[in-house]
Amino acid sequence: MIPAEYFEDIRLAVDCLRRGGVILYPTDTVWGIGCDATCSEAVRRVFEIKRRADAKALITLVGSVAALERVVDPDAIPDVAYELIEFSTRPTTIVYDRASRASGIAPELLAPDGSIGVRVTSEAFSRALCEAFRRPLVSTSANVSGEAAPETFAAISREISGA
């Protein structure tokens, strides 16, 4: 269920994501740039906006353990990962050996060895967004690579917000 105060923003974000667009959104760490993690064109656009080398990985954000198990082959998720997700008090990204072949994850999000970094978000807006979109999101800080990550929307540079 989407909280009423987020409904319109989430509706607009999901519409943009479904069209292959890129969004700015609050995450459980900083303000982020996001896109559909299954859309190669959108993922490449995020790299372009950030002026980030393809070799520097982006993480994938999901809203639940069930969504994680659609992105990562459940056999590749060790028990300790479930414990970290359940008990960690801080945002934790875990690198898994391989994505599920059925996940449709854009190949640009996989490391050369096939591994993938995924975080199960606990932040209310990003979790509601993941649940409404029903696909994994790319999550990376809303800054040009090498610059400070914005903790507030107002701190996002015009270069990023206007891209």
Where is each model-derived feature located?
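Active-site-adjacent structural elements in enzyme catalytic cores
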Residues: 1-163
